[in-house]
Swiss-Prot record:
Name by which UniProt lists this protein: Protein FixB
Annotated residues for binding of FAD: 255-283
PROSITE patterns for this protein: ETF_ALPHA
Pathway where this protein functions: Amine and polyamine metabolism; carnitine metabolism
HAMAP family: FixB
Gene3D superfamilies: HUPs, TPP-binding domain
UniProt record, GO biological process: carnitine metabolic process; fatty acid beta-oxidation using acyl-CoA dehydrogenase
Gene Ontology molecular functions: electron transfer activity; flavin adenine dinucleotide binding
InterPro entries: DHS-like_NAD/FAD-binding_dom, ETF_a/b_N, ETF_a/FixB, ETF_asu_C, ETF_asu_C_CS, FixB, Rossmann-like_a/b/a_fold
Quaternary structure note: Heterodimer of FixA and FixB.
Similarity remark: Belongs to the ETF alpha-subunit/FixB family.
Keywords (A to Z) from UniProt: Electron transport, FAD, Flavoprotein, Transport
Length: 313
């Protein structure tokens, strides 16, 4: 048996739902999708859900992962085994841990490939900081996986599909975190995993002010702006949501233009699936040139304005 009888899907990030649903179609005979509202439920059916389970009644001061109890109860009531697919977001991983405990299931994070043999999931994901690919065969009846972005192609909606909708009522967990206040986060983040063209800056750009040069190039060619982890986490020059690497974004654009990025393996794991990699770096021995299809050795502060001017003609 090369499929599960049932798969259960949930995404706290709507943009990740299409790829999870496409993976579900390949891995199971029946697809169940947990959603938070009617609009997401209708979309899930178009993506192939046989059953939609709308999570309802959570107080505004509680977290989404507090639905784990009723989700696990629903899963157990409809089969003695099954596969759970979640995005590898922070909230997805929190929910995976809670579901794994309640279902007595093995949990595997950041899956980059999933297959089913004899009713058991085999999962591949990066290990040793991206230096190798590990493979796990999950022996527990239930398997809970968080899926890396780009593991599956996005499912295409089909308005002719039909499915059944059910309601799952909130049940307060015995122990929970209560939100007492919220603060809006200033962020201009985009869905970088959907971008065709990406310009990504590293500390070699020199300063936060010089990032404007990369932004101008983005406008000229219609690209999205990303960065390396040190730019976001250490220097605080850009938002966390924009950094590319093994612990965050895994991109597959048509073009990845790396500006002032050294090319350490932890970063390149998130970029080396790009169709074309173009590197700009002052250091001719930078590791990035081992991955690049094209490269320029030189000062990005001088090269970026020249590229922008050339594309603007």
């Amino acid at each position: 048996m090369n499929t599960f009888s049932q798969v259960w899907v949930f995404s706290d990030t709507p943009s990740r739902l299409p790829e999870l649903m496409n993976g579900a179609q390949a891995l199971a005979n029946q697809i169940n999708t947990f959603v938070l509202n009617d609009a997401d439920g209708a979309l899930a059916i178009q993506f192939g859900a046989n059953h939609v389970w709308k999570l309802s009644g959570k107080p505004d001061d509680r977290m989404i992962e507090d639905y784990a109890g009723v989700m696990a109860d629903t899963i157990r009531q409809h089969g003695a085994d099954g596969l759970v697919l979640l995005p590898n977001t922070r909230r997805g991983k929190l929910l995976a841990a809670k579901l794994g405990y309640r279902l007595k299931a093995a949990v595997s994070n950041d899956a980059s490939a999933v297959s089913v043999q004899d009713g058991k999931a085999t999962v591949k994901h990066m290990v040793y900081g991206g230096l190798a690919i590990g493979e796990e065969r999950i022996a527990t009846p239930y398997a809970v996986l968080t899926i890396s972005s780009g593991t599956f192609d996005a499912a295409q909606p089909d308005a002719s599909r039909t499915g059944e909708t059910h309601t799952v009522a909130w049940q307060a967990p015995a122990v929970a975190i209560t939100r007492t206040a919220t603060q809006a986060r200033q962020s201009n983040s985009v869905d970088l995993d959907k971008a065709r063209l990406v310009v990504s800056v590293g500390r070699g750009i020199g300063s936060k002010e010089n990032i404007a040069l990369a932004e101008q190039l983005c406008k000229a060619i219609g690209a999205e702006l990303a960065c390396s982890r040190p730019v976001a986490e250490n220097e605080k020059w850009m938002e966390h949501e924009r950094y590319v690497g093994i612990s965050n974004l895994m991109l597959k654009p048509e073009l990845y233009l790396a500006v002032g990025i050294s090319g350490q393996i932890q970063h390149m794991v998130g970029a080396n699936a790009s169709q074309t990699i173009f590197a700009i770096n002052k250091d001719k021995n930078a590791p990035i040139f081992q991955y690049a299809d094209y490269g320029i050795v030189g000062d990005a502060v001088k090269i970026l304005p020249a590229l922008t001017a050339a594309f603007a003609r």
